[in-house]
Amino acid sequence: MTDIAGQQRRPAYTVNVAAAAAALGLLAFAADSVDGVAGHVMVALTSSGFAWGLAAVLAGRHADTMRRAVTGATGVLVLATVLYYLLILLVSRRWSGATLADGSSANMAGLRSVAVMTAVWLAGSLLAGPLLGLLGYAVRANTTRRAALAAGIACGLLSAEGWHAIVQAPPWRLLALGDPFFYGVAFGEIVRVVLPLAALGWLVAAHRLGRAWPMLLASTAAAATAGTLLWYALGLVQGA
């Protein structure tokens, strides 16, 4: 069995889930207003699939029951999504102020866009939250081999957004453009891959999973590949 020292009980667990959701939503909203290289780094750290997915995995890891792992991880993502889009709707109001080709207001189109994206990410939260929560719980509460499988799947999925970005726009090509803006894009892509691998290393050390390294490598590679395809499909939905 792996280390079980990380579990939390109510009410501390509920408070921590709510605090994590608030932090995710606020930081993601703040990252949108940062320009340049710093902006790309902020987005990679606070408003990426890695950042939000890791929060869900950790919510599952610290739960004391499987059911709470599911509800906690899903709650983090749902609450953060709602807060983020509420801030866009009420504070930044970046959906408003534009005009159509005929000179009329584009506010309704902007509101529809916010509504659609809110629905898409809420659906994603409801699908990804339970899975990531269960993976986090399995890392802590299962045998070494099964914990290694869960850790590899989790971190492979967390790195998928970065791999998808690298496939779409390889960082070496971006760096060759010699533009500081694209330097930031390239750095953000790399961060989205390096940090999930660092998280995997931490889980391996914390739960002594090194003996199951073949399982770790295979599950990480398979999950990263599957996750990259899912991000590609999501891009098609967003562009439709």
Question: What do these predicted ranges mean?
Answer:
Residues T71-A80, A150-L157, W213-A226:
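Central hydrophobic cores of alpha-helical transmembrane segments
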Residues T228-A240:
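Juxtamembrane boundary at the C-terminal end of a transmembrane helix
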Residues L24, A28, L79-Y84, A128, ...:
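Alpha-helical transmembrane segments of multipass membrane proteins
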Residues L86-L175:
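Membrane-proximal helix-loop-helix units in multi-pass membrane proteins
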Residues D3-Y13, L58-T71, P130-L149, L200-L217:
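Cytoplasmic membrane-interface segments at the C-terminal ends of transmembrane helices
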Residues A160-T225:
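Hydrophobic secondary-structure block in the mid-to-C-terminal portion of proteins
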Residues M1-R94, G103-N107, L111:
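N-terminal topogenic module of multi-pass integral membrane proteins
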Residues V41-G53, A109-L127, F181-P196:
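Alpha-helical transmembrane segments of polytopic membrane proteins
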